[in-house]
Amino acid sequence: MSRRGDWVYENNGGTCVAIAGADYCVVAADTRLSVGYNILTRDHSKICELADKCALASSGFQGDIKALHKNLAARELLYQHQHNKRMSCPAMAQLLSNTLYYKRFFPYYAFNVLGGLDSEGKGCVFTYDAVGSYERTGYSAQGTGSALIMPVLDNQLKSPSPLLLPARDAVTPLSETEAVDLVKDVFASATERDIYTGDKLEIVVINKAGTKREYIDLRKD
């Protein structure tokens, strides 16, 4: 019989969302870090800016998440030295997949969503499972509140399926401002039902002009 002592992971909660538009990408996550019914900190960023116009948001076990982010940052720095340019967002998406798959027999307990701009300046979102399987979509949510948020995003966005032929761009029809407002609304709703999501919302908006961050307050109970 399995015992709790055999389980080496801890889920520290939190929720991550990314939305891709025609010329922008929004990556957002709450800042609560918790274990069970205990809040460890109310100001923990789950978003890491890695490559050129690219941000990774992760939920799960923070020990593994920190190790994963550090690994990817080191690989991206090595790429810069070797190629004299920053890694693109699709290239980072493939690197993340390879890194997760490499650890598949003792996986990083991290559930990731990567967002940014591709080589054509279009928004792109890549969503993952724990062992590196991924796909490019118009939007995604990961973490403890994802089951509450994804139905709302499905209803509001209806991004084209990557399985449709002929292929269509997996971007959402909303403007940048509308996408940010939608992210605020879904997080405000999720915090009413998910005790592991809350405190503050960190929003990273990526477009051709660069990257900007915004913070808003969420429920703190």
Swiss-Prot record:
Keywords: Cytoplasm, Nucleus, Proteasome. One of its GO terms (biological process) is proteasome-mediated ubiquitin-dependent protein catabolic process. The keyword Acyltransferase does not apply. SUPFAM superfamilies: N-terminal nucleophile aminohydrolases (Ntn hydrolases). GO terms for cellular component: cytosol; nucleus; proteasome core complex, beta-subunit complex. This is Proteasome subunit beta type-1. The 26S proteasome consists of a 20S proteasome core and two 19S regulatory subunits. The 20S proteasome core is composed of 28 subunits that are arranged in four stacked rings, resulting in a barrel-shaped structure. The two end rings are each formed by seven alpha subunits, and the two central rings are each formed by seven beta subunits. The catalytic chamber with the active sites is on the inside of the barrel.
